[in-house]
Amino acid sequence: HLPFPDGAADILLDCFSPLAIDEFRRVLKPGGYFLYVVPGARHLWELKQILYDAPYPNEEKETPYEGFAYTDIVPVDFPLHLERQADIQSLFRMTPYCWKTPKSGVERLETLETLDCQASFRVHIFQKL
């Protein structure tokens, strides 16, 4: 339960979290927006290639939600250049890969001194009807 009254919000942002679509419907004003940020197909692809023997791209899909118009998908892509093992580990620890990577992948990652990879996001924009 979001701590806002019904119809109080003009805009909501959900970044890499499960959607609380019923709560979004409740707290958004008519005509209000919610932005749903998800990883793009090749988000952190170079990192995944180090961690996994057979990495796969993230699924990209358009999912309609009742009571909302799907207005746009905005791609946000940019390179990351990490120059220290500590920074590589910080990136790794903030991903779900940290919890499911095989030991061999973690060991490969620990040998790197630098890492160049691509961040890739998709911002799905919805407007409440």
Label every PLM stretch briefly:
Residues 19-35:
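A short glycine-rich, Lys/Arg-flanked "PGG" loop and its adjoining helix->strand segment in the class I
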Residues 1-12:
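A short acidic, Gly/Pro-enriched loop at the edge of an enzyme's catalytic core
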Residues 33-66:
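Conserved class I S-adenosyl-L-methionine
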Residues 5-7, 25, 47-48:
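Short, well-ordered secondary-structure micro-motifs
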